[in-house]
Design a protein with these regions (language model features):
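Intracellular loop-helix junctions on the cytosolic face of multi-pass helical membrane proteins
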Residues: 3, 124-125, 131, 153-331, ...
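Hydrophobic core of transmembrane alpha-helices in multi-pass small-molecule transporters
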Residues: 13, 94-110, 395-417
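C-terminal ends and interior cores of transmembrane alpha-helices
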Residues: 78-96, 377-396
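Intracellular juxtamembrane helix-capping segments at the cytosolic ends
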Residues: 109-124, 415-430
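Cytoplasmic membrane-interface "Motif A"-like loop-to-helix N-cap segments
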Residues: 65-77, 358-377, 433
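Small/polar beta-strand repeat architecture
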Residues: 465-553
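Central cavity-lining transmembrane alpha-helices of secondary-active solute carriers
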Residues: 46-63, 146, 339-354
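Helix-loop boundary and gating motifs at the non-cytosolic
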Residues: 1-49, 281-284, 291-303
């Protein structure tokens, strides 16, 4: 195994500890500390992940063309550390947005460089080890994420957000140091530009910043039903336009020669054909996988687990045995349940590699595309389980967390089939000089698009609930214009300046903001009684409602329908993939052994 691989693996372990630790507690932090509505929190977290997996496009170009992988990683890692620091020391929506923005730029910028750096350590002489190296790389991701996902919720619950965000920030600093120590161990693939890199970056940013600015403007001016979709289409269309104008108009004469040559290699000829072919597979099918998978990663699955109706006693079935009473009383935190995904990965990777794939190979040729197709069906099935859980919770029935763990088993099987396969597939299909870019433009951008779709759905499914008055006291009733089509257990969000305070956990007084549940429906008086979303207890409140300043909303996808929507969508995409995959022809690009430095 090449000597640089251990440094890459350790760096990835620490960086993923940081990213997944922070991501694991974001939804709980936003809903319980900042009092975001659940849909709003999902939108924010999805947009954060959108940025984290879109900015690899920028990092890949900077790496491939201007600075090379090492300088790009070290520079953007500092930006990453700054974002973590802002998040750990801040305390409101503004600092949250700034911290997440810097984190997205930093983690996104270094992501394609680190992962493709794995492949760069190999030649045609030892290419048979690439799959094993990528497995080690992926295992380091899941080991780091599993540890942080388990401990960060404990720190948030016991010590608050400063410690819970501060420890991952320290791990990111460690990741930067470890990567720096491996500098002399890496096989270095030089960037396209050997001179004038800073001038080239200036030209690059001159074209990029207007694209980002216009896309952000579109996001702000378009209504919530279509804003994410409109901004995404605008962003991708403008990027294509910039590339076209740069290659086919007089602008080509103003570009540095190395940048122009790189763009011609990336966007013309065989490379363009590869990108086009990969784009359909990744932007539609792999993107849908990530849309579903990321919701299990600290988002809607975690929010589901915050309900007290999910019994989170992991070993509760041992309660009748006196010797195991302490173990039976152990209760997981909602943000911790997702840790089983990483643990299942550690077990399933060797099982699939050495048992399941060989068995499958006796019946048919196990190709990357067939793995992906099977995985799409499998992950859709996991959402049927989660939908059933949500249906029980909505109707006030207790559900064991083991049902959600079962859903994670199914989801993790899909992840092994798709994620590792798609990562390796993207690298092997990419021409040599543009591997970082194609990794970003396919595998990582697919994650970004998947999260954009999640944000789009959660933004579009929110609908206003005209509210005339709110009666406060030991019970809180909201008088509405109409209670038609509302259900008991349905979520209802309060935002803006409601003028009302309520008593939360531990007797803390907070503004009436965030997600609540409809307890009872008084159809005769067109009013609903509010319950808190976690304990399902009556909301105790005081104050005078301000209808002109308050924002009261609910969701179009009620209860289990949210998860059934995604299950159906995933299943439909899986069926379509079966037909599309038959038209794709694979190629493999690796460095020739003769090109390896002495």
């Amino acid at each position: 195994m090449p000597s640089g691989i251990p440094y890459i693996v350790v760096n990835e372990f620490a960086e993923r500890f940081c990213f997944y630790g922070i991501n694991a507690i974001l939804a709980v932090y936003m809903t319980q500390h900042l009092h975001f509505g659940q849909a709003q929190a999902t939108v924010w977290q999805s947009l954060f992940k959108f940025g984290a997996y879109f900015f690899p496009l920028i990092g890949a170009i900077i790496s491939d063309v201007f600075w090379g992988k090492y300088r790009t990683i070290m520079t953007l890692a500092i930006v990453y550390c700054a974002g973590c620091t802002v998040l750990a020391t801040g305390g409101g929506p503004t600092t949250l947005a700034l911290g997440l923005g810097l984190m997205a730029l930093g983690t996104g910028g270094i992501k394609p460089c680190v992962s493709t750096n794995v492949g760069d350590q190999f030649t045609s002489k030892n290419q048979h080890l690439i799959e094993r190296a990528f497995s080690y790389f992926y295992l380091s991701i899941n080991a780091g994420s599993s540890i942080s996902i388990y401990f960060c919720p404990i720190w948030l619950n016991a010590y608050g957000p400063r410690v819970a965000f501060g420890v991952p920030a320290a791990m990111m600093a460690l990741a930067t140091i470890v990567f720096g120590l491996g500098r002399r161990k890496f096989v270095v693939v030089p960037p396209a530009m050997s001179h004038g890199a800073n001038r080239g970056i200036a030209f690059f940013l001159l074209g990029l910043l207007p694209v980002l600015g216009i896309s952000a403007w579109i996001f702000n001016v378009v209504g919530p039903d279509y804003r994410t979709l409109a901004a995404l289409i605008t962003l991708l269309a403008l990027l294509v336009l910039v590339v076209y104008l740069s290659l086919n108009t007089g602008l080509r004469h103003a570009l540095p020669a190395e940048l122009l040559n790189w763009m011609q290699e990336a966007f013309t000829g065989p490379a363009l054909k590869q990108i086009t072919g990969l784009a359909l597979i990744y932007y539609v099918f792999i993107a849908m996988f990530w849309c579903l998978w990321d919701q299990s990663n600290g988002q809607t699955w975690t929010l589901q687990a915050t309900s007290d109706l999910m019994d989170k006693h992991l070993f509760g079935f041992l309660g009748g045995i006196p010797a195991f009473s302490a173990l039976a009383s152990y209760q997981m935190l909602p943000s911790q349940i997702q840790v089983v995904n990483g643990l299942f990965i550690l077990g399933m990777v060797p099982i699939f590699t050495f048992v399941i794939y060989p068995i499958m190979g006796k019946f048919f040729k196990v190709t990357p595309l067939r793995k992906i197709g099977i995985g799409l069906f499998v992950i859709s099935a996991s959402y049927l389980i989660v939908a059933s859980i949500e249906n029980h919770i909505m109707h006030g029935e207790t559900v064991s967390l083991w049902w959600q763990i079962l859903a994670y088993v199914v989801l993790t099987a899909a992840e092994v089939l798709i994620s590792i396969t798609a990562l390796e597939f993207s690298y092997k299909q990419a021409p040599l000089k543009v591997k970082s870019f194609i990794m970003a433009a396919t595998y990582l951008l697919a994650v970004s698009i998947g999260n954009a779709f999640t944000a789009q759905v959660n933004g579009a499914m929110v609908k206003p609930v005209p509210t005339l008055a709110v009666t406060t006291g030991e019970q809180t009733w909201a008088q509405l214009e109409s209670v038609a089509n509302l259900q008991r257990g349905q979520k209802i969000d309060f935002g803006g300046d409601t003028g009302i305070k309520f008593i939360g956990d531990g007797g803390a007084v907070a503004p009436l903001e965030g997600t609540f549940l409809i307890g009872d429906i008084d159809a005769a008086h067109k009013r609903v009684r509010l319950m808190d979303a976690i304990h399902r207890q009556p909301v105790v409140s005081s104050g005078e409602f301000k209808p002109a300043l308050a924002e009261v909303t609910t969701y179009k996808l009620v209860g289990p329908m949210y998860f059934l929507f995604f299950a159906g969508l995933g299943g439909t995409v899986a069926v379509l993939f079966v037909f599309v995959a038959g038209f794709y022809r694979e190629r493999t690009y690796v460095r020739d052994a003769a090109a390896e430095p002495a």
